[in-house]
Amino acid sequence: MMKKIFEVQKPIIGMIHLKPLPGSPNYDKNKFDMNAIVKYAVEEAKILEQAGVNGLQIENYWDIPFVKGEEIGYETCAAMTAAACAVKNSVNIPIGINVHMNGGKAAMAIACASGAKWIRVFEFVSAYVSYTGLTEGIGGELARYRKMLDAKDIQLLCDVNVKHGSHFIVHDP
């Protein structure tokens, strides 16, 4: 699967950590409005591409404190789509989307709109406890959403035992 996206088996994926987006408690349009956020993302993308990474993952990393996937707002999706489209149009390497925290459906929608090649999902199966509370696996829901969008060309990069919390189950089946 990795060669399908990156043309190498073990890619180096650079991270584009977007500044706080509209809707985030830390968003300050006087300091970083959307034009500045997009400009910064594009500058970072070009630097990382020149450094030789094989792809770029765009994340709302500074939208802290994070909310669970089903609580992610439309404003986050809109802002991330604007940034992702600008980044994609400024580089010649593939991009992917990760929406904190476990926002697989939001990431899939953004990927469809922006032409991203993959999404990252923190918890595809099982459940874990993190600073956002109980986060449940979204594999079944995401598979159905992906089918509905006819997005089989968008790959899923999913964590197992994600670093962002402790698993809720006490015994693996």
Model-derived features: where do they sit?
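A short, N-terminal amphipathic alpha-helix
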Residues: K39-N54, A86-N89
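Alpha-helix N-cap and loop-to-helix initiation/capping positions
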Residues: K29-Y40, E71-A79, G133-G137, V170-D172
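N-terminal small/glycine-rich loop or linker at the start of catalytic domains
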Residues: M2-D33, L149-G165
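Conserved anion-binding
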Residues: L21, K105, A109-P173
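Glycine-rich anion/phosphate-binding loops
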Residues: N30-A45, V99-A106
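Conserved, mostly hydrophobic/aromatic
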Residues: G14, L48, L56, I119
